[in-house]
């Protein structure tokens, strides 16, 4: 399965347009909060994920659904219009990537780097603080960290900052060992 949080070219363009509008209208933090909230809703709801991903729903149905979600959640008007536009243009599948791109643009605008941390089990507050400190010292910037649990990595940690991936997972170490043994 493709990584739906990776920004496509279309998602990047939508994110850039929204970013410019939020700067012009002085709504950057509010719209960013809305989009982060929507991202959490999509992660938590299989029905919402299905609405975005399934070709069985028309662009019009997706637009109506996203607009209803935005209204129910109390999103900014700009956010609601953006969601409706993306869906009605048949780009609902690019929405999560657009959100990721927007959040990265916003963080860059604030002078903060975004880092996605993937672990096999949830991190404690102390562990998260340690990761944050390590990322900050490595990059020289304050990190904004989002965490995700992926049991398939077996153990260790993966940290993605922009296009760079620091992979210290047990899965990758085992894969490397397997490859080395096959070559021997």
Swiss-Prot record:
Q: Kindly list the GO CC terms recorded for this protein.
A: plasma membrane; proton-transporting ATP synthase complex
Provide this UniProt record's keywords sorted from A to Z: ATP synthesis, Cell inner membrane, Cell membrane, CF(1), Hydrogen ion transport, Ion transport, Membrane, Transport
GO-annotated molecular function: proton-transporting ATP synthase activity, rotational mechanism
Has keyword Transmembrane helix?
Answer: no
| Primary localization class, coarse | membrane
The protein's topology relative to the membrane is: Peripheral membrane protein
Q: Where in the cell is it found?
A: Cell inner membrane
This protein's record includes keyword Signal: no
Kindly indicate where the leader peptide sits in this chain.
none
**Pfam name, any one:** OSCP
Q: Which HAMAP family match?
A: ATP_synth_delta_bact
Function (record text)? F(1)F(0) ATP synthase produces ATP from ADP in the presence of a proton or sodium gradient. F-type ATPases consist of two structural domains, F(1) containing the extramembraneous catalytic core and F(0) containing the membrane proton channel, linked together by a central stalk and a peripheral stalk. During catalysis, ATP synthesis in the catalytic domain of F(1) is coupled via a rotary mechanism of the central stalk subunits to proton translocation. This protein is part of the stalk that links CF(0) to CF(1). It either transmits conformational changes from CF(0) to CF(1) or is implicated in proton conduction.
What do we know about how this protein assembles, alone or with others? F-type ATPases have 2 components, F(1) - the catalytic core - and F(0) - the membrane proton channel. F(1) has five subunits: alpha(3), beta(3), gamma(1), delta(1), epsilon(1). F(0) has three main subunits: a(1), b(2) and c(10-14). The alpha and beta chains form an alternating ring which encloses part of the gamma chain. F(1) is attached to F(0) by a central stalk formed by the gamma and epsilon chains, while a peripheral stalk is formed by the delta and b chains.
Protein family according to the UniProt entry = Belongs to the ATPase delta chain family.
Its name, as the record gives it, is ATP synthase subunit delta
Q: Which organism is it from?
A: Caulobacter sp. (strain K31)
Name of the gene? atpH
């Amino acid at each position: 399965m493709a990584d739906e949080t990776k920004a496509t070219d279309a998602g990047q363009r939508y994110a850039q347009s929204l970013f410019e509008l939020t700067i012009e209208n002085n709504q950057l933090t509010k719209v960013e909060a809305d989009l982060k909230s929507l991202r959490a809703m999509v992660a938590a709801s299989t029905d919402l994920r299905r609405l975005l991903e399934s070709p069985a729903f028309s662009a019009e149905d997706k637009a109506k659904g996203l607009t209803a979600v935005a209204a129910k959640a109390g999103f900014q008007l700009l956010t609601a219009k953006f969601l409706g536009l993306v869906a009605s243009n048949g780009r609902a599948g690019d929405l999560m990537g657009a959100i990721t791109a927007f959040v990265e643009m916003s963080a860059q605008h604030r002078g903060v780097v975004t880092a996605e941390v993937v672990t096999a089990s949830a991190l404690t507050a102390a562990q998260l603080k340690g990761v944050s400190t390590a990322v900050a010292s490595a990059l020289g910037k304050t990190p904004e960290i989002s965490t995700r649990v992926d049991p398939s990595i077996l153990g260790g940690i993966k940290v993605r900052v922009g296009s760079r991936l620091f992979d210290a997972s047990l899965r990758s170490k085992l894969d490397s060992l397997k490859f080395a043994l096959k070559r021997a």
